[in-house]
Amino acid sequence: MTTGLSTAGAQDIGRSSVRPYLEECTRRFQEMFDRHVVTRPTKVELTDAELREVIDDCNAAVAPLGKTVSDERWISYVGVVLWSQSPRHIKDMEAFKAVCVLNCVTFVWDDMDPALHDFGLFLPQLRKICEKYYGPEDAEVAYEAARAFVTSDHMFRDSPIKAALCTTSPEQYFRFRVTDIGVDFWMKMSYPIYRHPEFTEHAKTSLAARMTTRGLTIVNDFYSYDREVSLGQITNCFRLCDVSDETAFKEFFQARLDDMIEDIECIKAFDQLTQDVFLDLIYGNFVWTTSNKRYKTAVNDVNSRIQ
């Protein structure tokens, strides 16, 4: 990718790092999933032709923004979709490919310096993707969810609202992240994959997003903490504790594990297919995060700021 490594707001992550806790916390996440979810997610396998179609559509969508993205970076982005959907219930592979493309191109937007954002160029590309892969009604829902996500990402980059919600309490923080982490968008572009009436309604009302936000965000925040500190970003729940204080960190981490367990146990009240989709998303995101290059180092060629 044609990108430089941003140093704006960079901090000394040697003084503020979760690296000392990496092995123990990964073990505790895994034990929690083994105990409360049990069924390990499986990866959706795209054919070479399907992957090439996805990457070509991704390249076409971001080309108007003047950036070239490597296949390696696209494959890093698409991994979360391959691991976090529910392959045993997929009924529409065209909708699945739509999620692959929309996920990847909005990842680029999220990783991009906001000075490069151009709604007039990018939104028509999102609409084109939706109209290619979905029927008319679902295309409109997916497009509006995509538009809302990229608009929110742009408007909250340096917002006092974001600062207040991200630095006050876990409750305020997770309220903000329902939209900011993209899970509401995810659900509204994903429901056509399954053609399941109950899940469709939970996606459209945003209950699906609210049920899975903490399970996604806590994992994402732990493994992206060092990167986000290095870039001066505040959107991380572990900023709400002193990670250099081992006792304080462990208490905070346990509270967040308890949040995840509470949500997972409540998810078990939903119908079986909806349960599977929710839990495959939360658990699959953990599998992807712990195996993906994006989270291996604070800054590398698949997670660096696009400038």
Curated annotation (Swiss-Prot):
Protein name, entry field: Cyclooctat-9-en-7-ol synthase
Binding site for Mg(2+) 3: 220, 224, 228
InterPro entries to which the protein is assigned, alphabetical: Isoprenoid_synthase_dom_sf
Co-factor binding details: Binds 3 Mg(2+) ions per subunit.
Keywords: Isomerase, Lyase, Magnesium, Metal-binding
Secretion signal, residue range per the UniProt entry: none
GO molecular function terms listed in the Swiss-Prot or TrEMBL record: isomerase activity; lyase activity; metal ion binding
Domain notes: The Asp-Asp-Xaa-Xaa-Asp/Glu(DDXXD/E) motifs is important for the catalytic activity, presumably through binding to Mg(2+).
Miscellaneous comment text of the record: 3,7,18-dolabellatriene produced by the Trp288Gly mutant has potential antibiotic activity against multidrug-resistant S.aureus (MRSA).
Gene3D superfamilies: Farnesyl Diphosphate Synthase
Effect seen on changing residue 111 to E: Abolishes activity, no product
Motif placement: DDXXD motif: 110-113
Phenotype when changing residue 149 to G/H/L/V: Produces cyclooctat-9-en-7-ol
Organism: Streptomyces melanosporofaciens
